[in-house]
């Protein structure tokens, strides 16, 4: 994936975060070898930090992959005294793979697994949640916001990945559905009085927004 962040900066930021457990490092190797996108250790550490800062006990992930991001959230929830992280993917095999990794990390007890479309699963679950993480198909970002607003508590945190979209958001000739979805989600979150929003330029850009 092309990146807007200089390799030197990325290496420096990664050097500052704690070492990950061997199982998490193995997940990183798998992501590289299979070209499977993961949030990476720097964004993962940010997710862990945000969850710890707000004392999150109930977290909902929209688009969890094979459990890499879930590992950071689940560790935070466990250290916060317990709760649940909802892992949501569209594929049984990914759900099984995530379960294997998270059990190996000793975090399976705080994870609930769902196979289905993320917005529909969120709508079906009882809120409120302390933190929602959104990494679904980018064209669906704007459509997800109503469900997020209905399920996230006041003072809760929304984290959205890929919000710089490898620079495609700056290409005036790119009107593809995914690029348009990232642009519109950014507009919605930065213009709504319901949200206090920052775009953090690490990896592929991460939005951190607090619901008022």
Predicted regions and their residues:
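N-terminal auxiliary segments of SAM/dcSAM-dependent transferases
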Residues: 1-24
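A short, mixed-charge helix-start or loop-turn motif at secondary-structure junctions
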Residues: 9, 29-33, 130
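Short, basic/glycine-rich phosphate-binding loops at helix/coil junctions
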Residues: 24-30, 165
């Amino acid at each position: 994936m092309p990146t807007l962040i200089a390799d030197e900066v990325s290496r420096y930021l990664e050097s500052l975060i704690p070492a990950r457990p061997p199982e998490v490092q193995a997940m990183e190797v798998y992501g590289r070898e299979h070209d499977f996108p993961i949030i990476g250790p720097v964004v993962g550490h940010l997710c862990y930090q945000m969850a710890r800062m707000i004392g999150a006990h109930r977290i909902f992930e929209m688009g969890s992959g094979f459990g890499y991001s879930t590992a950071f959230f689940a560790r935070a929830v466990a250290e916060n005294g317990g709760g649940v992280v909802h892992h949501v993917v569209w594929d049984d095999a990914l759900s099984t793979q995530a379960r294997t990794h998270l059990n190996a990390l000793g975090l399976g007890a705080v994870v609930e697994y769902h196979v289905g479309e993320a917005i529909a699963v969120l709508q079906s679950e009882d809120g409120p949640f302390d933190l929602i993480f959104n990494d679904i198909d980018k064209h669906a970002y704007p459509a997800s916001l109503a469900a997020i607003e209905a399920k996230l508590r006041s003072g809760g945190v929304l984290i959205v990945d890929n919000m710089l979209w490898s620079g495609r958001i700056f290409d005036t000739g790119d009107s593809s559905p995914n690029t348009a979805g990232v642009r519109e989600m950014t507009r919605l979150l930065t213009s709504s009085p319901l949200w206090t929003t920052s775009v953090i330029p690490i990896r592929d850009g991460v939005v951190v927004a607090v619901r008022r």
